């Protein structure tokens, strides 16, 4: 079915101004000469006025729309970062600057965050933690992004190195990271995007991953709050009409950045999927290829959709019951995986 929502495309360039027809020049020069003989302003001022009026303005560069937020942005390389979400790692740094913030279940029923940066990069971000086996398949939707992570068990490192991802771990590239801040180790590792991306100069630029942005669709259920229980931790989103976005909380505490800003997004996706044990038998493997139910939160309402991703290199689509693509609100998107 044809998609009626807005797809991220560049805007049209500025229209060129109309130039004064060449045949008017002799007339203007003649008038200028007459003006000079009668004591009027010098001919040069009249010519200058004509020249200013007839010069076309510079054509503006076509505006690019981020496929991750639906907002105007530069088309930059994609930087994916694994972010610590242990209680001792909070508050995190620069999650408010990400285009997409994801929340994943890890071992012990705890949660971890992944953040996607492309529209702009902060100076510092973190705390950075380890990667998981499912990240290799999950992040392929961004083609060949740079992946910043502290380290991982050897089997996961091997998978990352054999994949199209550009792994930039602390173990291999310590000069792109630093220890600091108020948190105790191991919750105090921070990365610098400029240095991280310098290690992955061929990282893919932002491209369509299946998100669509547009006006709020009809229907939906008015919703004030939605909680995802990960087992030993939980993530909650509360609608704020005042801020016109969903405010995030971790384990009942308001999620904030080290900048003091409250974290949250304009759109929240709660994607239900299977999470069998990975090859280690200890960590959930979040299935991001397949299909299932997803609840999309926007504008104070919950919309029931169906998510589908046919392969690791395919986009993830979110479809309403009538077959239309679910339009997201423009701005930061949060994606939370819930075990079904």
Q: What are the residue ranges of the model-derived segments?
A:
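Sec-dependent N-terminal signal peptides
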Residues: 1, 28-45
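Interaction-prone helical segments in low-complexity regions
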Residues: 2-4, 51
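N-terminal export and membrane-targeting signals
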Residues: 4-32
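Serine/proline-rich low-complexity intrinsically disordered segments, especially terminal tails, linkers
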Residues: 6-9, 47-48, 68
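Intrinsically disordered, low-complexity segments used for protein-protein interactions
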Residues: 19-27, 45-49, 66
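C-terminal region of N-terminal signal peptides and the immediate post-cleavage residues
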Residues: 39-61
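A surface/extracellular/periplasmic glyco- and lipid-processing/surface-interacting theme
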Residues: 55-100, 107-340
